[in-house]
Amino acid sequence: GPILGKVDVGGYYEYLGLNSGNGLNKHIMTYGASGAGKSRGFVKPFILKTAQLKQSMIIVDPKAEMAEQMSEYLREQGYVVKMFNLLNKDNSDGWNCLGEIDGNVDKVQNVAEVIIRNTSEDGQKADFWDKAEKNLLVALIHYVCTLKDPLTGELLPIQKRSLATIYDMLSSEGQKSLDAKMRSLPLDHPARAPYGIFKQAASNLWGNMFIGLGSRLNVFQNKLVKKITSYHEIDLELPGKQPCAYFCIISDQDSSLEFLSSLFFSLLFEKLSDYALKNGDERGRLPVEVNMVLDEFCNIGKILDFKKTISTVRSRGIHCQIIAQSAAQLADRYPINEWQEIVGNCDTQLMLGCNDQMTAEFISKRCGNITIRTTTSMAPQTPIFSPITRQVNGYKQSTSNATRPLMYPDEIEQMDNSECLILIRGQKPLKVM
């Protein structure tokens, strides 16, 4: 299994890893503040070990470091290597999310939900405008996915059926033009129902809804974003069939493209789970196990139903290695105890270092308490100015038991950068290097 750390045994190091068949799931939650060595200490060794096992890996790579250092090595090991590069788009393979739909109505709903949720203000509940814009988006996705060549009657090439196509329709066509297109569709066309619900709103609001949805998709003004989301070169089912290494390179500063990385992982989990059920072994597991190395997890965007996903994908042969800077960051992205459900589904937790009180207190409680023995001594006392020299209080010593945290929060914050804590369900905490 994955290497978690090393211990000094008589002058040489022994590496510690998870044994397979131990009854634990392979989800790992890793906490590490900036500079704590998450990439060097966890991600890179994990990639090397996974390559030995010939398992697939999907790696979030915030600075493109892992792609630069490991992609050639992985190709030499027989891996199919692809990059969905939202940082340096010139060097990206194409991935068109509408190419994953295959006429599935549920997938259309999921794509629309991810886009609306990741382009709304944090903490904002879905209101009238969100719901109306979502119905408009669902209708447009159905319409664009079924666009056909008027001469041959065949579906248009996938690069002409993309989210960029929807943005172009919103920016160049009026509501009357779109109305005419929707009326020309067959009565049983899947775009008609959501468009009909959208039109239940007062007609004087339609223009505002067009503008609102267009604003959510305005990243498609960028020609490179249009290009990498139009062509379809990344197969989301392939990692379950043969060893693949996909690098999703994101910006940890620009959040405007978060909905694309969230779409990538939301559909990836869904496609792999579906493939496992249809083509897996008798237990419904993938032929090739897939590891999701979710570095900078909180900057990927909100993955659809992630707390439910992480609790079910283990049985499909999909394992998540979540890496966050702090528990506070997790709680901000997945509030109201949702983050604790996610952490609770990880049987292994690593603490590489933190500098915030919430994470330190959380890990301190997870480490539990220990019993210590305290000895209290009282020396003999003689009054200073008394002419009588006899002892007033004799020497006393008492011993008692007390409890204290295995590690106080301040001790966790003061851990050396070369140390880490390993917390495994059913085992005592372990401090290693």
What are these regions (language model features)?
Residues 3-14, 19-320, 328, 333-336, ...:
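P-loop NTPase motor domains
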Residues 310-312, 316-424:
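Conserved ATP-driven motor cores of ASCE-family P-loop NTPases powering translocation/secretion/packaging/pilus
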